[in-house]
Amino acid sequence: MHGDTRDQSTPVAHTVDPAVAESAGRMDSDTRTDPAMPSPRASGAVRTESSESQASTAQAPAAPPATDQPATAARQPGAEEDLTAAPRRRTTSTRRTTATAATRRAAEPGSAAADAEPPARKRAAGKSTTKTATAKTGTKTATKPSARKTTESDTVIGRIPVLDVSPQIDAGRRPAKAVVGETFLVTATVFREGHDAVNANVVLRDPRGRSGPWTPMRELAEGTDRWGAHITPTAPGRWSYLVEAWSDPIATWRRTAGVKLPAGIDTALVLEEGARLLEQAAAGVPKKEGRAHVLAAVDALRDPGLPPLSRLAAALAPEVLELLARYPLRELLSASRPLPLQVDRERALFGSWYEFFPRSEGAVVDPNGVEPPRSGTLRTAAERLPAIAAMDFDVVYLPPVHPIGRAFRKGPDNTLTAGPHDVGSPWAIGSPEGGHDAVHPDLGTIEDFDHFVAEARALHLEVALDFALQCSPDHPWVNKHPEWFSHRADGTIAYAENPPKKYQDIYPINFDQDMDGIVKETVRILRFWMSHGVRIFRVDNPHTKPVVFWEKVLSDIARTDPDVVFLAEAFTRPAMMHTLAKIGFHQSYTYFTWRNTKNELTEYLTELTGDAAAYMRPNFFANTPDILHAFLQQGGRAAFAIRAVLAATLSPSYGVYAGFELCENEPAHPGSEEYLHSEKYELRPRDWNRTDTLAPLLTVLNRLRRRHPALQQLRDLRFHPTDNDQVLAYSKNATTPEGLTDQVITVVNLDPHHVQEATVTLEGDGPHVVHDELTGAVYTWGRHNYVRLDPSAEPAHLLTVRRNPT
């Protein structure tokens, strides 16, 4: 957040609890607001709800002032206004009061009290005639987020409790995540004593601290006290959100009137109480928005010539209900403390990735082994880009392009002895020709790399570069920075091991001798490649480096280049994977490769699309140069098609490694997940003109993903019952820019060897006309639907449904 640059003009007089006013501090951010739209208004200063005992750090926005009693929160003359429509506050008495300087600070724009003040109902300074009850309280508010200490407001429940706000990452110490235009659900527990009605809304604050739009919440299930609303950030940056709750006197009156008037109980009194409430609310409805409708209802409630139920009906007219929903009358306003939200660009969530080794494109290999192989170059690799773009991929991902060490170089299939012409592993980085900021001479020059990036960009492809923070024994760092490596008892540098695997050609980094130096060098290298057009990095094995190291590196990059995306290749324990996501990685590899049965997929995707979706975004690679799963080895072409459909429709980001479309599935040996003739250790030119390619299927999947917003999001995934464990059915839903409901239903045969039949059960009413994007067939589907899927033909249905919103 930036320094306090708010309007310093004199605020309108108002009343606030003196104890609160004395301790109220200014939020350390630019909280000026847009004059276009007002924000919710309340009958009192907002109380911070902190009974969840959630610690706050410099990353979290400062909490608003807290008070037990209602207070007028006046807007400064000339200050910019909030972005949303403003609910009306209810006043309780009429005596002029004067604000203290501390009180004025508490009501500055950006404080919760100021955010609650509606610009549509401004009063001139010195003209206020309202009085509110006050009571002394020991509540304090820190002046800066970084200096915020635990106070009474951290432990005392507000007048209207607001508890368990979600999403909330590490008690608010880390931001929840979304991308521009992504809609997600905010929930909270809201209730009060007795039977009076409560209501709630979410306030979303943009990176400049402007509040709006506020979004009404609803009780998710009657009697649960759990409220929710969907919000959608519209620009990248660090946002925040909070939940406001209040006592709703008009809703309480409606409920009472609906019982008493038909029974003839207290008829005149009930009608007059309603008239007074609506009269107060009408003052908060702008004339141009329809204030006259509310005033007409007031007149009807007081019209003795009308029957009581007709007078009530006027107050319940649709236009009156709609206006008071937009401009509610709020009492006893309470609020959660603001929670941070990091909003990234779309590619952080959605994209189709294609990985290939540039040295194999244009390579020449003598099948008889007589002539030495000739490596492809970045220029010849660029010739492959049009075919990748034609399949509608979004990202082309390159393994390391740096010089490869010669010491302990690996031979074919990871053999320990390399021949004179063996090319080695690209992950054994560094030679006398250079390190992480150099291009392998066989691939060309940095100018050739720039050409590759430019060609990709012209085809609307982004380039992702592998970043592997490790060295070959020949890397310049070995001599320049020996303290960056671990040394064994005999003085030699320890090579990498992941028992039973040994990587004698790779030296891992030791971060504990000079972490600051390694951070500085890492940031320099990343910025070097960023200056050459790379805005996505796939980070190799980040789980083998300290989390705090990555936090330092990623925060440094995000400070100036928040559009740069980092994918964590972390096949590791859940705690590490989730923590890497929380500290700044935008995406993560997952266990998708090893989830193949109906139960495995359902359970795993339920986990990923649940609470974890607020901070961890999966990228489902169907294969990698390291992993050829037994399902692909044994299932043939149908298995590849099945896994492609699953990856492309379950996750908004997915990828394949070159050769997937050719169904390459020969393992190094039985039981191995390594490829025979692994491209990690040798050149592998391919015949892309083969007719048995899966490229047409990948193209259909990628085009479908681009056309359907439902497939571009993670959180709204629903599994549907089937009566066959070999048939998996699920759907995704989203709203299109045109306001239509976009739904994609996927039904997959998980058995690559046999035809499977099942009945798919869908919730809701039918029938609906659905279109199969794979075959072009059109079906009418209702609640129970028969399917028959032949893996040798089409192993899945990809059904699209479009309806007008209800």
Task: Kindly give the residue locations of the regions a language model identified.
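Carbohydrate-interacting/catalytic domains
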Residues: 1-52, 56, 61-63, 68, ...
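Aromatic- and acidic-residue-enriched carbohydrate-binding clefts of CAZyme catalytic domains
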Residues: 347-376, 404-452, 479-516, 676-684
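Hydrophobic faces of well-ordered beta-strands that scaffold small-molecule active sites
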Residues: 352-354, 396-398, 463-465, 537, ...
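Short, solvent-exposed turn/loop segments enriched in Gly/Ser/Thr/Pro and often Arg
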Residues: 397-406, 467-476, 540-546, 569-573, ...
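Substrate-binding cleft/loops of secretory-pathway carbohydrate-active enzymes
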Residues: 472-483, 550, 558-559, 571-599, ...
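Active-site neighborhood of glycoside hydrolase catalytic domains
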Residues: 479, 483, 487, 510-580
